[in-house]
From Swiss-Prot:
SUPFAM superfamilies: Cytochrome c oxidase subunit I-like (SSF81442). Gene3D superfamilies: Cytochrome c oxidase-like, subunit I domain. It comes from Loxodonta africana (African elephant). This is Cytochrome c oxidase subunit 1. Cu cation binds at H240, H290, H291. Component of the cytochrome c oxidase, the last enzyme in the mitochondrial electron transport chain which drives oxidative phosphorylation. The respiratory chain contains 3 multisubunit complexes succinate dehydrogenase (complex II, CII), ubiquinol-cytochrome c oxidoreductase (cytochrome b-c1 complex, complex III, CIII) and cytochrome c oxidase (complex IV, CIV), that cooperate to transfer electrons derived from NADH and succinate to molecular oxygen, creating an electrochemical gradient over the inner membrane that drives transmembrane transport and the ATP synthase.
Amino acid sequence: MFANRWLYSTNHKDIGTLYLLFGAWAGMVGTAFSILIRAELGQPGSLLGDDQIYNVIVTAHAFVMIFFMVMPIMIGGFGNWLIPLMIGAPDMAFPRMNNMSFWLLPPSFLLLLASSMVEAGAGTGWTVYPPLAGNLAHAGASVDLTIFSLHLAGVSSILSAINFITTIINMKPPAMSQYHMPLFVWSILITAVLLLLSLPVLAAGITMLLTDRNLNTTFFDPAGGGDPILYQHLFWFFGHPEVYILILPGFGMVSHIVTYYSGKKEPFGYMGMVWAMMSIGFLGFIVWAHHMFTVGMDVDTRAYFTSATMIIAIPTGVKVFSWLATLHGGNIKWSPAMMWALGFIFLFTIGGLTGIVLANSSLDIVLHDTYYVVAHFHYVLSMGAVFAIMGGFIHWFPLFSGYTLNYTWAKIQFLVMFIGVNLTFFPQHFLGLSGMPRRYSDYPDAYTAWNTASSMGSFISLVAVILMVFMIWEAFASKREVSVMELTTTNVEWLNGCPPPHHTFEEPAYVKSNS
């Protein structure tokens, strides 16, 4: 029965599909918010209203894209679908908890949307810093609803993380060691550990904010001996690992795509890739204060956070050059998924370079809260995480659905999206360098030209999103079935056919060890 299958599902493939659909829908909402932002900024002067409504839209855009698009698709969608198949497990370790992890997200989304419907909305930015998020600057229920939304999304992610860690460690065949796992499995394992360690700190921080707002505590209020800087430390101790949570599964997917379409049986430097991801995961926890260079830290503290942040470039560089080495000498197949992966490598590297610039505390003091920062993190998210999702989706779509996409349309869509995102975010570097601040709905006329270019780019990206929807419709309408898959011996998720049966591995998978 339909309701039983989809509401009470304990099947990793069905839950993965639910995550993908939910993430796609949230992605539409988040895209709509971003179009509103760029429409407002396309010309000087006011379009939608004051800065409060503008910042409510910015905040909603961030939360929707992070917690309801990237994480559900990468970890929930691809993770649920692929991890059990890749390690030969019959399902996830805790199938019913898996179901709950998903069904906590729609109520969480509902609370977030409710927060913008009551009072003036939560116009705090996704960081929700007090005192702006306190009960004077944001009277009413908006910020409280946002906090509850974050709590639900956080519980969902923590349960999901426990589930993935248990599944990956405990449900491999006896012959498969840690170092025989595909890189995507590694990336999800490391991501899950990061979630498990960072989310409780966020929960503590926003719970203290909640009591400051409603129960008259003064954790973040200097009048009662509190300190708003404490909130920033708690938030960014979560917030920085979070950005690595958003990109690590993308690293895993790109490794698979680049290896597959280079005709290689394994990625270059497997162990280097694994250790690079583990290093990134570890270092991600000890650099959080580089988001706070402007709050007045000691010079030696700033020196530490500058150098620690720069060290992350080393394992990241290991990954980039290993991808290039995987490509080297390969029989390269220019499929759309490969194009997304190559676009990922190039644009993520550019985003990484601007990150190195911002790691310098002296430079960051000038660039902090300008559009240079916006350009930086959108290069690594809008062209890193999103490109990885697009490449992964196109690569594994035949596995999920049993049908193939039209490759010509897929290549056109890639080209449109590539032009759109670059036209949107490249000019923002110039705006930032000339001092245009973030989180304002209006700006001096001097900034008009680059803002107009940026807004044009966002509308091109919108066309690409619509093209994507059309491509998926076209694939299901045409029903071109998958004829044959290549390289299945080193891509075990394809071994059970396209799509795989509802229950795979009803008896334990036999894995022969080559080492």
